Structure formats: C-alpha cells, structure tokens
Amino acid sequence: LCNFASMLENQYQYELREAGCDEAGRGCLAGPVFAAAGILPPHFHDPLLNDSKQMTERNRDKLRAVIEREAVAWAVEAVSAARIDEINILNASFEGMSLAAARLDPAPEFLAIDGNRFRTRLEIPYRCIVKGDGKYADIAAASVLAKTHRDEYMLRLAEEFPQYGRIKNKGYPTREHRLAIREYGLTPHHRLTFNHAIDQLEFPFWNKKSRP
C-alpha cells in the first residue's frame, strides 16, 4: 500500500509559525460544523497521518490522541445548526476556523487553510490550499481533530435521537437519514436551510421559531 504520510510536507511555509485549519461536517443535514486549528512541532511525523476522510475511524482516533499530546497548540470550535442557518454553511466554516485559530497559544503567524476560499477578521496572513489536508501535515492534523470531535458529538446526539440513525450517518445525507426525516420530521439539531427531502413529498417539520 502507498504510504500517504511520506508524501505530506510538515507545513506550507517555514518562515512563520503556521497553523493548519480545516473543518468537518459541512455537507451534513444535522449537527454543528466543527473546525480545528493546530500548530505542529518541527519535523512532526506519524505514518498514519493523512486526510481524515482517507483514514479508518480507528486510525483517526489513534491520531487524535497523538496530535493532542504532541501539538504545540490545538483548538476545536463548533458552529451550531442555528448559526449555520443564520449565516450559511460557508461563512459558518470560516467562522469556526477563525475562532479555533484565535484560541491558539502561542498565536499563529500564518494560517494554512484547506479549501479554495476563506474570510476572516483575524489579522493573520493565510493561504487557501485545495486538498491541503492531503498535502500538509498541519492541515491533515486539523482535519483529524475536526472529524473526531464532531463524530464524538454526533454519537452523543444519536443517543438522544436514535430513530435518525446518527450512529451510522453522523448527520450526513444518507437515504436512511432522509427517510427518518420524512417519517419523524426535523429536530432542533437539523439545519433548516438545507434540503432534507428524499423526493418531492412534503414532510412535517418543527417551526423555525421554536428552535431553542
């Protein structure tokens, strides 16, 4: 098998203290979007590290412990479904990454952002890198943190709403999830501005004004 980790650069640039930033849960129908930022020590290397979407759940959990133990600094932020509905998912992702980066101590001097767009009020230079979580270790580490923290949250949520199958789908738009929405309606954790329908049939939903 190809060792993806051997192809990851530690970071995008080496002149400034860099934090990798990524998010998880952007395409989900329910739950927050989670964002993470992390500063890795020089020459950090772990043979398991790669884009979190390419890793097994077991390896992601192993790496989370390594990253949280060895990182110079790391932070994870969650942006709620209500906030996503208010400002849209793209801006919510930007907000989450900005909040996570702002919590880092020591503060980053440069941000390496996974993706092709970013906006922030932070006065920190940044670079957007398409598929950066498969190129740079600090972005991949942020990807792992965001994914594992979100999965952990969604598993707790699944205990509250077992009928939606979130232990399996974790809020993603699977057929099972859409069918459950059609049968049971929406919960306060669903994103009201997303398309939940499996077809053109109407289904009951909670009034947006009733969201706590």
Region annotations inferred by a language model:
Residues 2-212:
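RNase H-like, Mg2+-dependent phosphodiesterase core
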